[in-house]
């Protein structure tokens, strides 16, 4: 265990806990402003190794960052254009939704009545309103266009962060009373978070591609969208892969049938088994140093504090908190509670 950098007595701990509550309330209140900055910071952490690799090949840092950001902007434009097209196509196919779902409901009606549930298809049809879904999709398209400005500001922030990286060590050293120990702790946090995010991103990309290929092979509509969803939600520990499987399974169940939905379910189970339970633990190596319970609770906490982005980044944020606690006398015991002793 590292030697404590900060010494705290009992009274200071109580005072700091009170301050912590106030700070957390402030963060939650200002989440709309803070979340883009945090997201940009973690994107910069993912991209910085690529920039460093280009710099080692004697590419000027400004040029390396410019090339990387240009590629990302082009990819984002193509991705948003495709998503807009997919949502438009989904809007056009919505009238089929009501007719497709009525067939299984008609087959289900006698079974429900047989077990004592008195319900008619006409009553259920009253609650199936495709107009509500069309309104929802229209709002999504509007939000997608509005998100362009937010994405531009986010990428601009990432750009300046990547350009600022060489100056950060010197700035941090001037801020610290004990720069050697402090920089060691910061470097450890950066290495841990970077290791997790880079590997998690690689695994998520492969997961999304495999899900896309599986759905395309089964002739599922919007397979690319569901593959993209599998990529994004794979960052959420424990439940992300489950959430990613629900929309395509529901779509296939409504439009294709029960057996086709079972086939898609089996495909997702196989993907999660191979990547979530076999490949990812092997690639991650010794692990994150966090217990399984802490990973799940951090998902809830950061989701409450920062919203969906907090859920996506719950693990790296908790890693940073754990390393910070290890550098304080009063926080080392809390850091032990967060740890997985089997992986220490």
UniProtKB/Swiss-Prot annotation:
Pfam families: AI-2E_transport (PF01594). Residues 1-4, 52-61, 171-196, 243-257, 314-344 are cytoplasmic. It is found in: Cell inner membrane. Disruption phenotype: Cells have a decreased extracellular and increased intracellular concentration of AI-2. Deletion of tqsA results in a 7000-fold increase in biofilm thickness and 574-fold increase in biomass in flow cells. Deletion of tqsA increases cell motility by increasing transcription of flagellar genes. The tqsA deletion mutant shows higher resistance toward crystal violet, spectinomycin, streptomycin sulfate, 2,6-dichloroquinone-4-chloroimide, chloramphenicol and amoxicillin. Signal peptide: none annotated. The chain crosses the membrane at residues 5-25, 31-51, 62-82, 150-170, 197-217, 222-242, 258-278, 293-313. The keyword Cell inner membrane applies. InterPro entries: AI-2E-like (IPR002549). GO terms for biological process: autoinducer AI-2 transmembrane transport; quorum sensing; transmembrane transport. GO terms for cellular component: plasma membrane. It comes from the Bacteria. Keywords: Cell inner membrane, Cell membrane, Membrane, Quorum sensing, Transmembrane, Transmembrane helix, Transport. It catalyses: (2R,4S)-2-methyltetrahydrofuran-2,3,3,4-tetrol(in) = (2R,4S)-2-methyltetrahydrofuran-2,3,3,4-tetrol(out). Involved in the transport of the quorum-sensing signal autoinducer 2 (AI-2). Controls the transport of AI-2 either by enhancing its secretion or inhibiting its uptake and consequently represses biofilm formation and motility and affects the global gene expression in biofilms. Belongs to the autoinducer-2 exporter (AI-2E) (TC 2.A.86) family. This is AI-2 transport protein TqsA. It comes from Escherichia coli (strain K12). The gene is tqsA.
